[in-house]
From Swiss-Prot:
Cofactor list: Mg(2+)
Self-association state and partner proteins as the record states: Homodimer.
Name of the top EC class for this enzyme: ligase
Protein name: 6-carboxyhexanoate--CoA ligase
Annotated InterPro entries: BioW
Record keywords, A-Z: ATP-binding, Biotin biosynthesis, Ligase, Magnesium, Nucleotide-binding
Family the UniProt entry places it in: Belongs to the BioW family.
Keyword Transcription regulation attributed: no
Pathway assigned in UniProt: Metabolic intermediate metabolism; pimeloyl-CoA biosynthesis; pimeloyl-CoA from pimelate: step 1/1
Catalytic activity: heptanedioate + ATP + CoA = 6-carboxyhexanoyl-CoA + AMP + diphosphate
GO molecular function: 6-carboxyhexanoate-CoA ligase activity; ATP binding; magnesium ion binding
Pfam families, per the entry: BioW
Domain of life the protein comes from: Bacteria
Name of the encoding gene: bioW
Length: 258
């Protein structure tokens, strides 16, 4: 599809030094854009990093690089919002949705037992649905999904059609979840934010799409979660490489999302 050159733009911000020096993660961002959008995109990422509710960063890195790989275009996952009254209800629903996506109850509980230990992991944890064990070797870094985006005009058209607020947070989360789910090794994703002011989370997968859950934690809580439940019989290193390096653009088509 690509005649235009695209660039991967990444931002990360932390407090009390860089992430490598043990600093507290404040904010991050990923964009995949043509060059003429560079200045606007960098400014938006700068603003995002400087105005996050997790704190004021004293370290920030914004970098961009040309993307040489062919860009794949995929559809966004279908979206459904589940209204719940409290985090306990939200977490109970999340477990049920994970089970419906093909993760056994035993493996779900094994993951939940370890989620508190993973609260400092900056990226995602890969968890095998067969063994109930963590598959990535990235420790506190986690796996960072990169090189994906959803062009604003198409996202806004989708949001209007789907009766969803055209908020950048939804755009970024759904673009990431759609890329994660697209790969054959993916079974399900469990996520809630480390932002103390944002309590909505989701379960995503191929069977039921992107299932938003309106309360997954209490306000003021800075512990987030991102777990990818995967079929470990696939090549895990290939999956990690694709998550980090394969460029993906989301493009919604109305007739596809009936």
């Amino acid at each position: 599809m690509q005649e235009e050159t695209f660039y991967s733009v990444r931002m990360r911000a932390s407090m009390n030094g860089s992430h490598e020096d043990g600093g507290k993660h404040i904010s991050g961002g990923e964009r995949l854009i043509p060059f003429h959008e560079m200045k606007h995109t960098v400014n938006a990422l700068l603003e995002k990093g400087l105005s996050h509710s997790r704190g004021k960063p004293d370290f920030m890195q914004i970098q961009f690089e040309e993307v040489y790989e062919s860009i794949k275009t995929i559809q966004p996952l279908p979206v459904h919002t589940n209204e719940v009254s409290c985090p306990e209800e939200g977490q109970k629903l999340a477990r049920l949705l994970l089970e419906k996506e093909g993760v056994s109850r035993d493996v779900i509980e094994k993951a939940y037992e370890q989620i508190p230990e993973w609260s400092d992991v900056r990226g995602a944890v890969l968890f095998d649905i067969h063994t109930g064990k963590r598959m990535d070797q990235t420790k506190e870094k986690g796996v960072r999904v990169s090189r994906m985006d959803w062009p604003d005009a198409n996202f806004e058209k989708w949001a209007l059609h789907s009766h969803v607020p055209a908020h950048s947070r939804i755009k970024e989360a759904l673009a990431l979840a759609s890329k994660v789910s697209w790969h054959p090794a993916a079974v399900a994703e469990l996520c809630w934010s480390d932002d103390p002011d944002y309590i909505t989370g989701y379960v995503a997968g191929k069977k039921m799409g992107y299932q938003r859950i309106t309360a997954m934690k209490e306000y003021g809580t800075e512990e987030g979660c991102r777990v990818f439940f995967i079929d470990g019989s696939n090549d895990v290193n290939t999956y990690i490489h694709d998550l980090e390096k394969q460029p993906i653009l989301i493009e919604w088509e109305e007739d596809h999302d009936s």
